[in-house]
Amino acid sequence: MSLRDFSVLDWSRMSDGVARRECEALARALPHGLEFEDLKTHDYCGRTHRIAYFDGKEGGDLVQFVLAPGGEVSLGFDGTDFKPSNCQIESFAESATEYDLDPSITQFVDTQTSPRRTACVPPMLIEVVAQEVMPLEPVAEHDAIFARLQDEYPQGRTVEDHGDSLGEDSFIVKRDSDGTLQVSRRPATTLTVVEERLQKWGMRLPTCDEWEHACGAGAATLFRWGDETPIDFYPTDTCAEHRALKTAWVLSGGKLVYEAPAAKWDLHQRLNLFGLKIANNPYQSDLVADGPRALGGDGGCNICGGAGFFLGWLPLATAFRNPYETRIELHQNVADDYHRLRRAISID
């Protein structure tokens, strides 16, 4: 069976020898300079999958894709299937009272996730680690924007000054402990430009269905690892102690020096079953070809807004959809720290 029309079940039944030959043949047919690297068995949260890696070089940097099997798959989530822990129920109840939300955690989850459905998803190659939509460019001290940002951001911290539309670049402003200011420009671009650029490379954005399938890899639970979430820290923290240290750092005006403690829970940071580093930071979302045009986070809204810990983790749910978030417009700037580019390659 050709890789062009195989399903997850077909892939699992294929012998290593046949799988290797098919992947080598696929690599030879690709115009992207990717080479078939290897087959590796990968375990994630009690499930096992054989991953096919395809590697290449771009500007001297390693880029890596994996083969995502397709076929008829189950997507979406039904809130009544969620089995919350007592701690999750308690966390949500506090948030529901504070923000006047539906008091039922399962009903609320149902409104925040895409509906259960069956879809036919084609097999494809998909990038392991999403990249920045546009690379950063250093800004010279004599540039007028350098002086403006130096006056606006005097504190010793790293911030991003965002542009919202084409022509409004974003700037990363970092002041080192010795007072040295570093400014980098992130050129603005739009979804239209991104998709045109990908098309020239023989690549594309994944659709919502493809992204959801690649993220959950068949997991029927709310999150790809299960239903559970930590009860005393957010996805951007390594543990409760780390969260406390970051709060102290903010209160010190960025003067406190500390090292992040070791992670005590990191299922969201591990490669998922298909071998992807995906949906691990609510502040960052992957661009997609349809629907809301970005999945995998909420721009950090729940965390930044001070919502409870369960709501802070919810945007990492495989089928998460924010009903209050507007769809990204084609003319909107997407080259910022909130959006990432995860490229897909069709197997035609």
Q: What is each stretch, according to the model?
A:
Residues A68, V173, T180, S184-F309:
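Functional-site microenvironments in short loops/helix caps that host divalent-cation chemistry
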Residues L62-F65, G70, R116, V121-P123, ...:
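Extracellular structured ligand-interaction cores
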Residues M1-D16, V109, E132-V133, E160-L166, ...:
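Disulfide-stabilized, aromatic/cysteine-rich ligand-recognition loop
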Residues D78-G79, E137-A140, G226, G297:
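Short, solvent-exposed loop/turn and secondary-structure capping segments
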Residues F36-Q107:
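Extended, Lys/Arg-enriched charged tracts that mediate electrostatic binding to polyanionic substrates
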